[in-house]
Amino acid sequence: MKIRASVRKICEKCRLIRRRGRIMVICSNPRHKQRQG
């Protein structure tokens, strides 16, 4: 999980979702997981 100021899709499988008021990226590749800090 990377905590970043700006989250964006890295590949075409990345999905931008909103959880508990935070923008997150979920992907089949676990290295692409991100959360807005």
Curated annotation (Swiss-Prot):
InterPro entries for the chain: Ribosomal_bL36, Ribosomal_bL36_sp
Which cellular component, as a GO term, is one annotated location?
chloroplast
Single GO biological process annotation from the record:
translation
Which residue ranges traverse the bilayer?
none
Q: Does the keyword Cytoplasm apply?
A: no
Where it mainly occurs, coarsely classed, is plastid
Asked if the keyword Nucleus belongs to this entry, the reply reads no
**MF GO annotations:** structural constituent of ribosome
Places the protein is found: Plastid, Chloroplast
Give the record's keywords alphabetically. Chloroplast, Plastid, Ribonucleoprotein, Ribosomal protein
Return the similarity comment: Belongs to the bacterial ribosomal protein bL36 family.
UniProt-recorded name of the protein: Large ribosomal subunit protein bL36c
Organism of origin is Dioscorea elephantipes
